[in-house]
């Protein structure tokens, strides 16, 4: 040690080097038994599966049944006229209520007559890919793919050509968007014995786009095949015979079923001596038939949708007007009462 006199020399001051790495602090862990604070969290709806998970369904259903009394069959008489929609097939109709779109994968029709083997006359059956096509003559049906011609006592299978594009399950006025086509069966010649014919449909479809619709929204409209003329209505009556419209589905409709038409029905009625006025009706109610007219009748009138009541309209008054069409062929009948 260097001494200068009796005093010590002081050491130079030293500085501590700064730590390049900060000191690591221990984090406090939350107790595992303590629950999180309640928070509002969004939940996802489950049960739909994958977005592309379509449903395939198949089955066999009777779509029509008709009786042709002996000797009543004539060339071109319509026996069956059915527009193919989901509601026409019971199993498919229930399943289609939870989907918006469907595509037909297979479609076949079995014509099954029940009559003696010596019954004269026959039938032609064909499938019209356009459900709005009004040309259902023998030549038009025979020109379609899969059409058949047979004697009344012979069974045949119609294997038609149909669209495979997606259609809508809920029916509307534009039937090309909701139906793959129509099956039509016509008489050929006169049947010498009574014929009971059933039409079975073998089908398979693909359902897509899940949804939910009520049965009232999926009622299929019925297309008339013959015009209604004013001279077909009796003077003083409030209705007409169902067979005048040429639609088997309307003939088979139950009593008290109420339909709305897409075209107005003008009815002339008497206001007094020499005074005639015209009313326009949009609703018709089916009335039970009798021994002379088993298919029943249709009454025109006013429909109260709120109270679900039908009021019969004014009686028809002829006044010897010239023949005119009141409802043209191709008029759509859509059921509106609560029993559909």
UniProtKB/Swiss-Prot annotation:
UniProt feature, compositional bias: Basic residues: 22-32
UniProt keyword list: Capsid protein, T=3 icosahedral capsid protein, Virion
Region (Disordered): 1-39
Signal peptide stretch: none
Function: Capsid protein alpha self-assembles to form an icosahedral procapsid with a T=3 symmetry, about 30 nm in diameter, and consisting of 60 capsid proteins trimers. The capsid encapsulates the two genomic RNAs.
Protein family: Belongs to the peptidase A6 family.
Pfam families tied to this protein: Capsid-VNN
Domain of life, source organism: Viruses
Name of the protein: Capsid protein alpha
InterPro entries xrefs: Nodavirus_capsid, Viral_coat
Species name: Striped jack nervous necrosis virus (SjNNV)
Oxidoreductase in keyword set: no
A GO CC term assigned to this protein in UniProt: T=3 icosahedral viral capsid
Gene3D superfamilies per UniProt: 2.60.120.20
